[in-house]
């Protein structure tokens, strides 16, 4: 009888080698490209081209042609499993170890393993010194890239899975899905606006050469190019050589209110909203537009935004100077705490959700709003041109293969990812405001809250009335309210009569939730902040793991301290003044434990949760005091005799520990 003993061999996980062709930006290549642009007579392009479209296409094509010929191309292999500190010598030792394993030479294998350990320490030390040198030379981008490699941090990628052979069809379906709001024909209304506004005496906006130079030099080299393939690195590096021709193109566009078709073209990249993206609605349509167009948008925005500022809703916290997420959260929580401090009161909060809000802007409704704010009529015509007849296509990457959809031309919406779109949406929704002081509308871009501070039955009826008005306003402005994703959260600490009728919108019941995540902060109906603290604690512990991995490289303590401040402490500090005062001791202990572990690594005295909360509250209060236009400023009162802040009277502990009463009480 023969007994055959099976022998099993572990199969290693292998990442396929990726070959990539890149252009080498070395010194000789830069000099060749610079000479090419310096020797170019741009006047030849201007004289020989008929119209702005042709001129822009020729200039863009010429820039790409010069870049292709002046810069050398190099094919590189990317080994997925290789770390940057694995040198050739290290690789040869690892291969030698594999051979010993295959030959079952244990003695030789042990010797090689000892050599690998020593070599690994040497390689990691060398790589660590490179990263520290980048820090000393203020190369923050290179330093953070190296730190990510050391801690093993990778950006999460969600692959788009489609049926094989139907990728192009799916690509077209995505483009049609993103174009679904362009169903109305308002061409007559748009033509009437053009006719009424075109005859005006307003000055024509003009851009100077030094403005273009400044815009090009401020570009980030690593950003993606648009459909015209003109790279920001090229414009930034050769800003002096290219600014003349683009100054001419920009001024031509502003004078005649014409935008080249290629500049209005959007290359849509579907970006997953979550890890489990399956349906088309789970992908956010981010538009890549030409870099020169973004520069021109910045100039136009700077020209008309100061005119609009006085008219903007004070409860709109996005895209405003001296405003941010923290201000919106503080205004929201202060309303809740201060109102609940009065007897027999409760708060009903409606968190509204729009379907692709930016894609629903109607130009014929937006332009009159701009005109009413006193914006230059020629700028209004230029913005109208920017929003109408916009070609767009979807770019889809499945594995190593790319697919392009057919082109759709749109007259509705503003592309996500452009400079002007956010502020245009803010202006579009600017007149959507509450009619009652106790029912404010709090807005952060398209994240809108209707907050009802209720004491009486009449207040409740006003709340229902406001929702009805808001629904009608959305219908009149072609904004699609997603009732399924709209939620209601109720804060009610009354002992009796705390039953609430469900809210109805468009004959659909709005779901009432016990907690809701708004702008990164988790609110619960009991205001105990347990879920928020747990979320923060989980994130901090994840980053603490990365910090320990970084410490294993024996990096300089300054870099460790920077990592602690930027990646761990910042998580806790985010909106801490809004909830820190009312956090429970149980949650504080967990967070203090995490802070203590991190500070131990960098050999510093551990920071305390309460001390950090107090410091951040004081800092924020000073900013509010300095800004008289802040929505919280009217709540602050000064003594006529001493000039000191007057303490806010409170009835409940939760209001006493909230931001304003707590910060004013501890103000020096």
Question: What spans do the regions from the language model cover?
Answer:
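Surface-exposed loop/turn segments and immediately adjacent short secondary-structure elements
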Residues: 9-11, 21, 28, 32, ...
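Arg/Lys-enriched, amphipathic patches
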Residues: 2-164, 565, 571-605
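Non-catalytic, peripheral interaction segments enriched in hydrophobic/basic residues
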Residues: 77-79, 118, 130, 134, ...
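Catalytic palm active-site di-aspartate
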Residues: 1, 226, 265-268, 284, ...
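Conserved pre-catalytic core of RNA-dependent polymerases
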Residues: 202-415, 452
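Conserved, non-catalytic sequence blocks in retroelement Pol enzymes and Pol-derived host proteins
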Residues: 50-54, 80-88, 102-107, 134-138, ...
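Short, conserved micro-motifs composed of acidic
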Residues: 202, 465-468, 480-515
């Amino acid at each position: 009888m023969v007994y055959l003993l099976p022998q099993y061999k572990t199969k290693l996980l292998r990442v396929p080698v990726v070959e990539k062709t890149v252009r080498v930006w070395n010194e000789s290549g830069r000099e060749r490209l610079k000479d090419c642009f310096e020797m170019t007579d741009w006047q030849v392009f201007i004289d020989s081209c008929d119209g702005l479209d042709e001129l822009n296409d020729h200039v863009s094509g010429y820039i790409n042609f010069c870049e292709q010929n002046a810069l050398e191309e190099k094919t590189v292999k990317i080994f997925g499993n290789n770390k940057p500190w694995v040198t050739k010598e290290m690789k040869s030792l690892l291969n030698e170890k594999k051979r010993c394993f295959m030959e079952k030479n244990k003695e030789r294998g042990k010797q090689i393993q000892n050599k690998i350990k020593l070599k690994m320490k040497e390689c990691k030390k060398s790589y660590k010194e490179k990263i520290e040198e980048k820090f000393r030379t203020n190369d923050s981008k290179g330093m953070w890239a190296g730190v990510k490699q050391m801690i093993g941090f990778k950006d999460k990628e969600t692959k788009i899975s489609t049926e094989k052979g139907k990728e192009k069809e799916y690509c077209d379906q995505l483009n049609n899905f993103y174009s679904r709001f362009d169903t109305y024909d308002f061409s007559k209304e748009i033509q009437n606006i053009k006719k009424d506004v075109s005859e005006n005496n307003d000055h024509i906006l003009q851009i100077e050469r030094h403005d273009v130079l400044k815009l090009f030099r401020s570009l980030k080299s690593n950003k993606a190019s648009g459909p015209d393939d003109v790279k920001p690195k090229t414009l930034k590096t050769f800003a002096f050589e290219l600014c003349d021709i683009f100054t001419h193109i920009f001024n031509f566009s502003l004078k005649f209110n014409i935008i080249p078709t290629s500049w209005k073209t959007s290359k849509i990249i579907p970006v997953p909203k979550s890890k489990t993206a399956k349906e088309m609605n789970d992908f956010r349509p981010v538009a890549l537009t030409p870099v020169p167009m973004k520069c021109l948008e910045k100039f136009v925005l700077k020209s008309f935004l100061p005119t609009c500022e006085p008219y903007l809703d004070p409860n709109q916290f996005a895209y405003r100077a001296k405003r941010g997420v923290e201000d919106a959260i503080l205004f929201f929580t202060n309303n809740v705490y201060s109102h609940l401090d009065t007897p027999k009161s409760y708060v009903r909060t409606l968190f509204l959700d729009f379907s692709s809000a930016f894609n629903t802007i109607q130009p014929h409704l937006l332009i009159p709003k701009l005109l009413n704010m006193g914006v230059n009529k020629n700028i209004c015509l230029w913005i109208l041109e920017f929003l109408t007849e916009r070609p767009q296509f979807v770019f889809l990457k499945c594995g190593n293969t790319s697919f392009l959809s057919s082109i759709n031309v749109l007259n509705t919406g503003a592309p996500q990812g452009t400079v002007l779109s956010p502020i245009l949406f803010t202006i579009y929704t600017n007149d959507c405001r509450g009619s009652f002081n106790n029912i404010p509308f709090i807005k952060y871009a398209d994240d809108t809250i209707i907050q009802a501070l209720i004491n009486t039955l009449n207040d409740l009826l006003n709340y229902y009335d406001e929702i009805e008005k808001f629904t009608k306003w959305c219908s009149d402005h072609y904004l699609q309210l997603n009732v399924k994703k709209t939620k209601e959260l109720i804060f009610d600490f009354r002992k009796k009569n705390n039953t609430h009728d469900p809210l109805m919108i468009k004959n659909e019941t709005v779901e009432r939730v016990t907690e809701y995540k708004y702008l990164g902060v988790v609110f619960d109906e009991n205001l105990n902040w347990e879920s928020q603290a747990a979320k923060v604690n989980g994130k901090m512990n994840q980053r603490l793991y990365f910090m320990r991995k970084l410490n294993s490289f024996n990096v300089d303590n300054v870099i460790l301290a920077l990592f602690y401040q930027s990646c761990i402490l910042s998580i806790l500090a985010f909106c801490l003044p809004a909830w820190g005062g009312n956090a429970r001791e149980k949650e504080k202990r967990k967070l203090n434990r995490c802070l203590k572990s991190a500070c131990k690594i960098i050999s510093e005295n551990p920071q305390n949760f309460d001390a950090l909360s107090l410091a951040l509250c004081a800092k924020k209060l000073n900013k509010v005091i300095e800004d008289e236009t802040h929505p919280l400023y009217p709540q602050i009162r000064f003594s006529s005799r001493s000039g000191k802040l007057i303490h806010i009277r409170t009835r409940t502990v939760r209001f006493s520990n909230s931001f304003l009463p707590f910060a004013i009480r501890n103000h020096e």
